[in-house]
Each structure stands twice: as C-alpha cells, then as structure tokens.
C-alpha cells in the first residue's frame, strides 16, 4: 500500500486535489467506504469531497459536521464542485491531533494521514500512518482493551473451523486459538469466537474465508460483525512467509522454525490468522507491531463454558440496550484493575482451588483496602505506559 500511495504522491503531473481522490479511491478499495484521507497542505490538514450528478467521492461534509467546522470549496467563486474544485474542510496543523482524536473516537473511520516535508518549492508528501479503530495507539480514550482481531474461517461438510488471533496494540498482548465445530454442533466454533470477541473487547475484525463455498453472509451475521469495523481479507500467506514474519516480529533465534518455537505447529488456521493480522497492522503502522508479547493460547478448559451468548443475555457485558454488570460493580481504582475485573467476570474459572485462593486473598486484604486504594489511585496505566516506553512513543506530559 505505501508504495502505491507514494507513487501517486510523487506524480507531479496531476493537480493535488486529483491525486487526493486517487488516494481516496485506493483507500476505499482496501479498507472500505469508511476510509478517509487527511492531507497536510501548508499549515492545514484538509479533506475533500466531490458531490455532483456525475460523481460522489470523499467525506468532507461528514467530517466537517463531526468536527463542527465550516465547509467550503477550493475556489469559492465557482459554484460547481469537481475534482479540480472540490468541496473541502480543514483544520490547522497545530490543533490537528485534537481533531484527529475526535474522528477516531467515533470508532468508525480508517484514517490515512498524509504529511508534508521540506520547504516551498521543494515540498514532498508521504503516507505517515493509517489509524483505524483496532490500530489506534496514540488516541485511546478509555481504559478497556483495544483489540484488533483476525479470523480465518474454514468448513468441512458444513462444520465450521475457525482460526482466531487478536492483538491489543496498546499493551502488546497477543492471543490465539483454533476451534473446530462438531457434527452435533456445526456452529460451535462460531459461538466460541463470538465469546472471545466479547471477552476481549474487539474494535476491528479482519475475516478471511478459506473455502469459497462458505456462506459469507451467514457467518458475518452470526458473528454480528456489522456492529464493528470489519474487512474481508483476500491475503492467504504461505507457510514460509508466516515463519519469516514471526521470526522477525517476535525476534526468534532458534534451530526450530518460528511456528514450532511458538508452539503453534498444530494450529494452522491460527498461524495463518496471526500472520494476516500482523501483516494488516504493519500496513497501518509498522512501529506498533514491535516488541509484541509472544502469542498466548486461550486455554478455554480452565473456564466455565458460556454458550448461547450468555455474557450478553446475563448483561455481564454492555449492549446497546442495557448497562452491564461490569459497569455496576466496577469500583476499581486503576485502569489495570478495571481490565482485570472484566477478565475475571468474562472468564469464570472452574478450578475450586483457584477460587478459594482468590477468596482468601480478598479476605486478607479487606481490612486494608482503604489505605491501599489511596495508593492505587495515584498509579497510572503501567501496562500501556510500559508499552509506549518500549516503542519510544511516550509523551513528556504522560
């Protein structure tokens, strides 16, 4: 993608507005209709749109309404809008991050940020980063996880098999599992994946179908993906590519292959899913894929099975219609505590020894909770701060 974008930006034969719409079409083709290009021009970041009888492209009006800024035309003296004289809106570069945070907070848009470098007349432009709901690293406003998930769906005689992987880009945690349905319950794998996405808050999904005969609409509706940002992937990485990718990303030095080193040789759908996911994130921002934790298998055998969408039906997690149990009982003092509370409620263990250990620990600390809470209230989100330090993305004010 970056090479294609740079090739368009280097073409000086076209007007900049025409180049902008070529970029917009390229982004929409790759990421869907909610893609938008924000381009730095002088001291402003601008967004363009054409809306006439012949063509409709761009999101200037939509973004202007969201940010409550004035919509105009490139040349106000010409009433008609076109690619040469588009509808436009812009924000000052000095306040760009504030407005970008507002766009990202919608949990809807995939934003391509094109920046400029150099001084006139030797100004050039480049794709800085692509920010989407699942790859949002710098503008997270809540304390929940921010997972981007990849699913590879296959089927054998109508029985679904799913490779699942997820990355929380804000903490660097990485999860995977492979689930197979049964002849008694052909949708078991889809039910499990639906639970995973509720347990690990998922803002964006890349879904790939290994069998062209799969009813894609049935799967998308079953997993309620239309309520999230999702993309249907076509990239099917070969095993050699997967090994090389994992070796570089996880910095593996071993006589074993990278997949063997990660103990994932028995879950081919999961390794493919993880490779697709990492490749997708690199396409947005290659820096945030650095220093990931090793993939952790979701050991479902430790937990009570929650079928039939139990977490939603019991209002453990929040839905559009009802508040959640988590919200009701959340009196934690730190972001890490809130995430742990959610993990405990959505992953009920069945090991009696572990349950008794937790009870004993709670009883032991109960009389000291007030002074401990006062200290905890002053602790920042260490998991995310540590991740930002590792990636040298920590701001001084943090």
Predicted regions and their residues:
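Extended, charged coiled-coil helical stalks used as long, distance-spanning scaffolds
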Residues: 360-363, 370, 377, 384, ...
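Short secondary-structure subsegments characteristic of cysteine-rich extracellular domains
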Residues: 391-398
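Secondary-structure capping and boundary motifs in well-ordered enzyme cores
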Residues: 333, 354, 371-381
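Basic, polar low-complexity surface loops/patches
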Residues: 1-346, 353-361, 384-387, 391
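Proline-centric
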Residues: 349, 366-367
């Amino acid at each position: 993608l970056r090479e294609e974008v740079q090739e368009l930006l280097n073409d000086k034969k076209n007007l900049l507005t025409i180049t902008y719409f070529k970029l917009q079409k390229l982004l929409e083709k790759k990421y869907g209709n909610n893609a938008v290009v924000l381009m730095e021009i002088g001291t402003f970041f601008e967004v363009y749109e054409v809306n006439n009888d012949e063509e409709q492209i761009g999101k200037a009006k939509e973004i202007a309404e969201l940010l409550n800024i004035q919509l105009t035309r490139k040349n106000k003296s010409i009433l008609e809008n076109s690619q040469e004289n588009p509808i436009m809106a812009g924000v000052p570069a000095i306040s760009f991050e504030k407005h970008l945070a507002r766009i990202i907070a919608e949990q809807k848009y995939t934003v391509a940020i094109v920046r400029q470098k150099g001084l006139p007349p030797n100004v050039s432009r480049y794709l800085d980063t692509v920010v989407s709901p699942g790859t949002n690293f710098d503008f997270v406003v809540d304390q929940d996880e921010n997972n981007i998930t990849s699913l590879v769906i296959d089927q054998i005689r109508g029985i679904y098999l799913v490779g699942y992987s997820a990355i929380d880009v804000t903490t660097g945690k990485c999860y995977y599992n492979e689930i197979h349905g049964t002849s008694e319950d052909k949708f078991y794998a889809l039910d499990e994946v639906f639970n995973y996405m509720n347990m690990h808050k998922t803002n964006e999904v890349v879904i790939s179908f290994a069998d062209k005969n799969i009813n894609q609409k049935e799967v998308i509706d079953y997993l309620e993906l239309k309520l999230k940002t999702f993309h249907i992937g076509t990239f099917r990485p070969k095993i050699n590519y997967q090994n090389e990718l994992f070796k570089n990303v996880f910095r593996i030095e071993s006589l074993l292959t990278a997949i063997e080193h990660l103990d994932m040789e028995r879950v081919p759908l999961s390794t493919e899913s993880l490779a697709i996911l990492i490749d997708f994130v690199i396409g947005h921002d290659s820096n945030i894929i650095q220093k990931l934790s090793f993939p952790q298998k979701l050991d479902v055998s430790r937990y009570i099975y929650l079928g039939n969408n139990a977490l939603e039906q019991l209002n453990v997690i929040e839905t559009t219609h009802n508040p959640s149990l988590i919200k009701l009982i959340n009196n934690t003092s730190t972001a890490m505590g809130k995430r742990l509370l959610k993990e405990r409620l959505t992953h009920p263990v069945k090991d009696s020894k572990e349950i008794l250990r937790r009870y004993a620990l709670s009883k032991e600390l109960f009389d000291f909770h007030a002074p401990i809470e006062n200290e905890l209230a002053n602790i920042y989100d260490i998991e995310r701060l540590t991740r930002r330090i590792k990636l040298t993305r920590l701001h001084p004010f943090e």
